[in-house]
Amino acid sequence: MKLAGQTAIVTGGGRDIGQAAALKLASEGASVAINYYSSSAGADAAVQQIKAQGGQAFALKGDLTKQDDIDALVAKTVEELGGIDVLVNNTGGLIARKKIAEMELDHWNAIMDLNLTSVFMMTKACLAHMQTGTIVNLASQAARDGGGAGAVAYAASKGAIMTMTRGLAKEIGPEIRVNALCPGMIDTDFHNVHTPDAARRGYEASVPVRRQGTVEDTANLILFLACEDSAFITGANIDINGGMLFS
């Protein structure tokens, strides 16, 4: 197994990309700590599935914009699972579409706290317990193209994740590798809420693969970046969008 004997933390692991990633890492031998904020049923279901297959896992609710919640997650992971080898920084969101001219500072700060500052805080807390390993960040296609109307703040936060990924890879290598993936249209609750159906159909018609991505597509890439199959890759921001950039 590609991650036998290793421990992974997956933030935002109660649904969609995070849940699929937690299950995928566990299927390759990792013990998994699943952070969630509101998706308790999905997080618990993932833990039950992992344990049913002979693995180790737990789920813990936490707001990763709060230091106490981060500290609790890291401490429980180290105590119960024995350390930290893989960190998947998946927590994030758009919150709501708001154009810059109409946006309050509080909304801007909330997006930055959720998508960027929480990644800094989580990464710093985990690095205290990582001698070697991998960090996988979730950026976005929006960081490449600026996002749609009302998503400028979201795109900016994800652009910062891409830059932080490159810089951190230089700062903490060679012992720890850091990479990010930049998903395009993935069939998730995020797009169910924030992307009109017509836009989703248009995406499917325009990209070379003629479909939206699945959470399994992203989980496969997360596994690749987390394990030694990608041993010569660090500081990379990898597109996973069905060919959107050149369609």
What role is predicted for each listed range?
Residues 123, 157, 165:
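Active-site helix of classical SDR
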Residues 101-120, 136, 161, 209:
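Catalytic Tyr-X3-Lys loop
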Residues 7, 14-16:
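Conserved glycine-rich cofactor-binding loop
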Residues 128, 169-174, 231:
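Alpha-helical segment proximal to the catalytic Tyr-Lys
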Residues 103, 146-155, 167:
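Active-site loop-to-helix junction immediately N-terminal to the catalytic Tyr of the SDR YXXXK motif
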